[in-house]
Amino acid sequence: MVVSRSPGGYRSGIITLVGRPNVGKSTLINSLVGEHLSITSDKPQTTRRIIRGVISRMNAQIAITDTPGIHKPKTPFGKGLNEMTTCALSASDSIGICLPVNQKIGSGDRFILDKVEAIGPYKKIAIVTKIDRVEKRDLLLKLSEISDLGCNFAAVVPVSAKRAVQIDLLKDVFFENCLNFSEKLFFDHEKPSVSDQISELIREKALCLLEQEIPHSLLVEVEEILTDSNRVFIHANLYVERNSQKMIVLGKGGRTIKNISITSRLAIESFLGKKVYLRLIVKVVKNWQKSESFLGKIYLS
């Protein structure tokens, strides 16, 4: 993990963002880092990988980790996502707990707080997300609700990642509270692998075009990437669990998969800075979320 011995006085830290699905963690990390690192969607449980962004200042570095939303899993796939988050928490020294201002604190939030407490004595920062969606009075009620939790938060910071409201303040809070190491832990611009980023771009575009029932059953695997001087050739598989879902992904006359391919290709071209030839194949693997052998081979290994 450590990439170099630091000069005298260098400080660094790791903060992991946690919260229920769809509370704004991915939009937040993209805003904090200033890049599109993590997939965003209005559909829950969008993040399926551990995404890390790095913020550097003079003699200091913060690594921010985005995690899949913590939930009570019903399948081996859901269990695997929770295990990813637990591993990320174990490697952290501070936790950013995301609480959307427009949703009441419920059993899911308390489940997460209990899980965090069970893993270790972390310094906790409450991040009130999506404040652009409510009036000031509602924000004050949310802050009172957080106070009633009785948690020993190091700070409570309301933000709007979408409109970049108080994002710089949140960075300041991170640097004030999360610097526990004396070494540089990561390269300044560390990102997920190219293959992972491409698969996430494809899945993001697919989520924008598909019906509500499909997202949880959709998995994207980049099988092959070939490059020459002028173009990148990419072959990716889109896995679903039922033939009926495959028909939805394909669409009438293949229109939906064509639109997914076009929007994905444009996004990948912007990301890579090259022309892209994209081949998408839709495959059915029955109940893949429950297949430990499939998940181990394709996704969670």
Swiss-Prot record:
Keywords: Cell membrane, Cytoplasm, GTP-binding, Membrane, Nucleotide-binding, Ribosome biogenesis, RNA-binding, rRNA-binding. Residues 66-69 are annotated as: G3. The keyword Transcription does not apply. The keyword RNA-binding applies. Residues 210-286 form the KH type-2 domain. Residues 159-161 are annotated as: G5. GO terms for cellular component: cytosol; plasma membrane. Residues 45-49 are annotated as: G2. It comes from the Bacteria. SUPFAM superfamilies: P-loop containing nucleoside triphosphate hydrolases, Prokaryotic type KH domain (KH-domain type II). Residues 19-26 are annotated as: G1. GTP binds at residues 19-26, 66-70, 129-132. Residues 11-180 form the Era-type G domain. An essential GTPase that binds both GDP and GTP, with rapid nucleotide exchange. Plays a role in 16S rRNA processing and 30S ribosomal subunit biogenesis and possibly also in cell cycle regulation and energy metabolism. Monomer. This is GTPase Era. The lineage of its organism: Bacteria, Bacillati, Actinomycetota, Actinomycetes, Micrococcales.
